[in-house]
């Protein structure tokens, strides 16, 4: 049995390395886009709470006053904007969140080091204890394996795949560095959220027939698919 979530335009995506942020990319009409946010909040009131947001304005043409109004609209919904991208810096005022860029170019000097001192970077993380409510585990170098359960309100963020040998009640976000082949496996799904490379589904969207069953999730184009593990 395959539980397929019908493709639709994503309201937001995730982006993250040392942290995970929502990337909001508004489209016109802005009022309709805000209604989508309201619908998400209505289904899950805490979905955006405490999560930093990057506002990508590359798809809209807003004046300074328009950006101000949009920021106020998001703030009224308890959504915290960490930074803005996709606009000219002259469109922003000092009171707005900072303009995010790709960073400055730099020249790296090669420094000879003792090869014996070099240690290979771990490509996986093994957690032998349960991840309790409120805890956040971020490992962007590779896979994360949890031998226990992941509690409600807890969060696992991985650059690779996520393997949970227990119940997943919190959030699991795999492939956060753009790994389209990442997967999520768990022995019992009661998740608040599943995400791969930024494409996500919340508890309300996951097929109810899969609840409390062992499953795997993967990304097919821009559609998150979930199937039972037999």
Curated annotation (Swiss-Prot):
What the entry lists under Gene3D superfamilies is as follows:
2.160.20.70, 3.30.70.260
Q: Which residues form a coiled coil?
A: none
User: What does this protein's UniProt record list under function?
Assistant: Cell division inhibitor that blocks the formation of polar Z ring septums. Rapidly oscillates between the poles of the cell to destabilize FtsZ filaments that have formed before they mature into polar Z rings. Prevents FtsZ polymerization.
In its UniProt entry, the species of origin is given as Rhodopseudomonas palustris (strain BisA53)
Keyword vocabulary terms for this entry:
Cell cycle, Cell division, Septation
Highest taxon listed in the record's lineage: Bacteria
Keyword Cell cycle in the entry? The reply is yes
Assembly with partners or alone: Interacts with MinD and FtsZ.
Q: Which GO terms describe its biological process?
A: cell morphogenesis; division septum assembly; regulation of cell septum assembly
User: Which SUPFAM superfamilies does the entry mention?
Assistant: Cell-division inhibitor MinC, C-terminal domain
UniProt-recorded name of the protein: Probable septum site-determining protein MinC
> Could you say which protein family the record assigns here?
Belongs to the MinC family.
- Read off the HAMAP family from this record: MinC
